A protein has these predicted regions:
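Flexible, low-complexity linker and terminal segments
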Residues: 2-10, 132-339, 344, 348, ...
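Short helix-loop-beta junction
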Residues: 39-45, 243-253, 469-475
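Short acidic, glycine/serine/threonine-rich loops at helix termini
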Residues: 36-39, 62, 83-87, 109-116, ...
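Conserved thiamine diphosphate
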Residues: 106-155, 161, 192, 196, ...
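A glycine-rich helix N-cap at a beta->alpha junction
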Residues: 45-52, 93-104, 186-189, 427-440, ...
Length: 582
């Protein structure tokens, strides 16, 4: 007997993997994809892991596929760049057990450094990509993706977006189907991509895509809804929901398979409607192909933006000419994103700011060190780039140029792609200083474990990678660990290491203030009679502190966790540490 539940899109994707008989999953956390892997933990039949990065995760999934079982890897859109190397070659080798890459794009860049469109990667890699429009489809499309993968001997990408991943919908749960484990047979010509084999496999890939393009015209995930023929929309994913909301009587061609496109189906649809709109978020992937076929009536990015998320109001405004009736937002004080109360990164940045040291930044909570009042991060490119960026600066301008620079990187990001960058500094005789902000978690995406925390995705306790020992093993003589909240020691060590003519690493250690199980026995309490109204305690921007009208400060004890940073900064002993509850 089936059961229905309300699930997030990401939860539905995980459920689809379970019902499809997936046995192995690997991922690196990244919003908006993270909950897919976290939702897999409940299924004992699936081995699920956090890998150090998306390339490794993809290779793990490929290995499981070659062994003959259904497998998957999960990542956000920028993670696809890291996974590109194995993905492009896996398109040539094909699969044994079904292989699906779940990729979550981020229109609007709610938590990302760019707005790239994974459909373009699928075209370049010559692999099919499917995209659901709600939670129910997310589950079903996941199962269908495995059928496509095994039928056409190819990896398949399932694309989600932030709005789909984090929206809820009603999903009918079904039983798991255990697929037959395919016996292993050595096939060097298929799986060993030396040039002679790869040349032949490229021919196979081209033939496969040609066959899929023909079959796409009759696939059930490409659906035509004929209604009012005066206007028609070609759309996909969450954008389909906006079309149905804004113009429910319009005819719609809903594309579930975005590569390859069903040309015959599209041409037939275009011929039957008077006006044709192509409504797709981000890049004109469908539009460019449709127009290349000579369908001149198609209208897309001429009126719809390539930036950000779409909405039903966008259709009402651009197609119907309506003025959207949107209530004006109340005027409230701006609340820019800031580090949490008690965040150890704030303490480190307070010292860097005091010493007027610039930082090459990386991806994580600590990117917030770029904004006022801390204002120490000058660059942020991608995962692991802080170390390489600092190295490039030194090689371009010399040692003197970086004497007031450091690279800052989190523990999880260091494990992701920072190690190679640090190795490069050692190998090529750099002299920069790297600060590893070790808060014992992958903080920004929701406190996931990694190789240096000693715990797996499934909660198994394992030996933790020792970051100090790892850095020393690279041949770095000057590696030190410092309490992230010890302002005096931080200042001393940073001054010493930045002046050193050799690669050095400072590991600042203190757990993320939001980690479960972290105890905060103390609170900070101001002493107004001693306060000199200098504002030194306010400079790091802790949200628990506010300035009173008379120039003294107040500390919100519901927010304060007693990290003691403000107390250390006060030269007049105008802040006390007290036991929580006193």
């Amino acid at each position: 007997m089936s059961e229905k539940r309300i699930l997030l899109g990401n939860e539905a994707i995980a459920r689809g993997a379970y019902e499809a008989g997936v046995k192995v999953s690997a991922a690196y956390p990244g919003t908006p994809s993270t909950e897919v892997s976290e939702s897999l933990v409940q299924y004992d039949e699936i081995y699920a892991e956090w890998a150090p990065n998306e390339k490794v995760a993809t290779e793990v999934a490929i290995g499981a596929s070659i062994a003959g079982v259904r497998s998957m890897c999960v990542m956000k859109h920028v993670g696809m760049n890291v996974a590109a190397d194995p993905l492009y070659t896996a398109a040539y080798t094909g699969v044994r057990g079904g292989l699906v890459l779940v990729v979550a794009d981020d229109p609007g860049m709610y938590s990302s450094q760019n707005e790239q469109d994974s459909r373009m990667v699928a075209r370049a890699a010559m692999v099919p990509i499917v995209e659901p429009s709600d939670s129910a489809e997310a589950k079903e499309f996941m199962k269908y993706a495995y059928d496509l993968s095994e039928k056409y001997d190819t990896p398949v990408i399932l694309r989600s977006t932030t709005r789909l991943s984090h929206s809820q919908g009603l999903v009918e749960l079904e039983e798991r189907v255990e697929p037959f484990d395919i016996p292993y047979e050595r096939d060097m010509a298929k799986y060993v991509m030396m040039p002679g084999n790869a040349i032949k496999r490229h021919v196979v890939v081209e033939a496969r895509m040609k066959q899929m393009a023909e079959d796409a015209n009759s696939l059930p995930i490409n659906r035509v809804e004929y209604n009012d023929l005066s206007v028609g929309f070609i759309t996909n994913g969450i954008a389909y929901q906006y079309v149905k909301e804004a113009m429910p009587q319009a005819s719609v061609l809903k594309l579930g398979l975005l590569n390859p496109l069903p040309r015959k189906l599209i041409e037939e649809f275009a011929a039957r409607v008077d006006k044709l709109y192509i409504f797709e978020e981000l890049e004109p992937v469908v539009e460019e192909q449709v127009k290349s076929w000579g369908i001149k009536k198609a209208v897309g990015k001429e009126i719809f933006t390539v930036q950000g998320e779409y909405s039903a109001n966008l259709i009402r405004e651009r197609v119907l000419g309506q003025v959207s009736q949107v209530d004006k937002a109340a005027k409230v004080p701006a609340r820019p994103p800031i580090l949490c109360p008690g965040c150890p990164h704030r303490s480190v940045y307070a010292v860097l700011n005091k010493l007027k040291i610039h930082a090459a930044g990386d991806i994580g909570c600590y990117t917030l060190g770029a904004v006022a009042p801390l204002s120490v991060i000058d660059t942020t490119i991608c995962m692991g780039a802080s170390i390489s960026t600092l190295h490039g600066m030194e090689k371009a301008k010399g040692r003197e140029y970086i004497k007031n620079w450091v690279a800052v990187i989190g523990d999880s990001t260091f494990m992701h792609t920072g190690i190679n960058s640090l190795m490069n500094m050692v190998y090529n005789q750099a002299t920069g200083t790297v600060i590893i902000l070790d808060n014992s978690t992958t903080g920004m995406t929701g406190h996931q474990d990694h190789a240096a925390t000693g715990k797996t995705l499934k909660g198994q306790v394992v030996p933790a990678i020792n970051i100090y020992g790892l850095c020393r093993s690279l041949g770095i003589e000057h590696v030190c660990e410092v309490d992230a909240f010890d302002q005096a020691e931080l200042e001393r060590v940073i001054k010493e290491e930045v002046a050193r003519d050799a690669v050095s690493v400072i590991i600042t250690k203190a757990p993320c203030a939001l980690l479960k199980g972290i105890k905060f026995p103390n609170k900070c309490r101001p002493l107004p009679d001693k306060c000199k109204k200098c504002g030194a305690c306010l400079r790091p921007g802790c949200p628990a502190l506010t300035k009173n009208e008379d120039g003294t400060i107040s500390i919100d004890e519901t927010m304060c966790n007693g990290c003691g940073l403000c107390k250390q900064l006060c030269k007049f002993d105008a802040i006390n540490l007290v036991k929580a509850g006193e």
